[in-house]
Each structure stands twice: as C-alpha cells, then as structure tokens.
C-alpha cells in the first residue's frame, strides 16, 4: 500500500482527469506511463486505479488491464433514473438546515455546480450510504455533465432552477429535479454521441 502523502494526491489527480474526460471512454490506462507522467512510482498509480475500479470510473479486465469505463446510452439512462430517485427521496422530508454559504461557494464549472447542488440536496438525508451512493453517481456523471450546456436546450436555466430550489419547499426541489433529469433523459443519445465524437478527435 502506498504512503498516504503519495497515494492521496495521485488518486485525486487521476480521478479528476477521468472526470474531465482527459482520456476517451474505453481507452487503455497504462500504469507505467501514468506513473512517469505523474512523477511517482507504479504503486500509488496501481492503488489509485484499483480504488477507481471500485468507484466505477475505471474498468479492470484480467489479462488486459485498466480502461476508462465505457458509458453507453443504457448505462447513462440507468444512472440518471437512480439519481433522480435518490434525490427525490431526500427532497420530501424536511432537510437539515442548508448553509447558504454552501450555495455561494466558488464553483468553476457547470458540471461542478450541478454536482455541488445535488450534494447539498443529499445533506437532507441522515442515511450515509445514500449520500455516498449519490456522490459516486455524481462523479460518474461528471464527464457527461461537461457536455450539457452545449447539448441540452435549457441547461443553464435548469441549473439555475436547481440552485434556487435548494432553499425552497420540497415540492419545488422535486419539480426542479424532474425537469433537469427529464431534459437529460430526452437527450441521452446526443450526449453519448458527442462524448464519442470527443474521444475520436
């Protein structure tokens, strides 16, 4: 096992690169090459890749090695369906008090802002497993969320509604969640097509 002071930054850097689409979906990830690029030994890279296999961002095939997890229309639809169910389940009960400072945090990108507001919604649940599952789904969807402003017809409006609903009534949160996810589901084919196009360039 790698020392924490080496493993943690290696893991975070690799995870962020995967979430940002640095490598095309399905591309082989060579631990030796990544170790050279990151300036670390193979051990923290392998440990990080194995952790990311558990999180669903990397696939491991015995005898073949690591690859960026493939994302299909079917798997994207499944993740979106589970995501909205999880978030709706914490929208109905009275959530724990949301700190308005969380909503004002400096988040750079559209994809980060979507993930951030969903994390805030999940704070309404005392169920730690539910929150962790939501975070895992959010991390896997990040690569697609980067594309939403260019693919979804009303992406920015949907995001503004989500952010505004964080401090609104449960019914408003559910309404915002459904509108956002309905828009995503209606454009799954296009999102996957654009993702594939990016990987081929």
PLM regions: where:
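All-alpha effector-binding/dimerization core of bacterial HTH-type transcriptional repressors
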Residues: 69-126, 164-175
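C-terminal all-alpha effector/ligand-binding and dimerization domain
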Residues: 147-201
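A ubiquitous short alpha-helical element
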Residues: 1, 49, 71-75, 104-105, ...
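Long, contiguous secondary-structure blocks with strong helical propensity
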Residues: 2-10, 112-119, 138, 142, ...
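Hydrophobic, amphipathic alpha-helical faces that serve as interaction scaffolds
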Residues: 82-93, 116-156, 185-190, 200
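Short, hydrophobic secondary-structure boundary micro-motifs
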Residues: 25-27, 61, 130-134, 173-174
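Amphipathic alpha-helix face/heptad-repeat signature
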Residues: 75-82, 110, 133, 151, ...
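Short linear motifs at protein or domain termini
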Residues: 1-93, 193-201
């Amino acid at each position: 096992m790698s020392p924490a002071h080496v493993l943690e930054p290696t893991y975070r850097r690799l995870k962020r690169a995967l979430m940002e689409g640095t490598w095309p979906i399905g591309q082989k990830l060579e631990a030796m090459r990544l170790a050279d690029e990151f300036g670390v030994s193979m051990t923290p890279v392998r440990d990080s890749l194995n952790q990311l296999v558990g999180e669903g961002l990397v696939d491991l095939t015995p005898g073949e090695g690591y690859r960026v997890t493939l994302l299909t229309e079917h798997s994207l639809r499944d993740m979106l369906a589970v995501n909205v169910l999880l978030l709706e389940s914490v929208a109905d009960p009275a959530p724990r008090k949301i700190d308005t400072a969380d909503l004002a945090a400096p988040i750079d990108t559209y994809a980060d802002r979507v993930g951030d507001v969903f994390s805030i919604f999940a704070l309404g649940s005392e169920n730690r497993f539910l929150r962790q599952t939501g975070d895992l789904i959010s991390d896997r969807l990040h690569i697609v969320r980067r594309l939403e402003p260019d693919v979804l017809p009303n992406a920015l409006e949907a995001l503004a509604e989500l952010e505004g609903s964080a401090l609104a009534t449960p019914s408003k949160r559910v309404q915002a969640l459904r509108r956002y996810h309905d828009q995503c589901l209606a454009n799954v084919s296009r999102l996957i097509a654009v993702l594939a196009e990016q990987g081929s360039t």
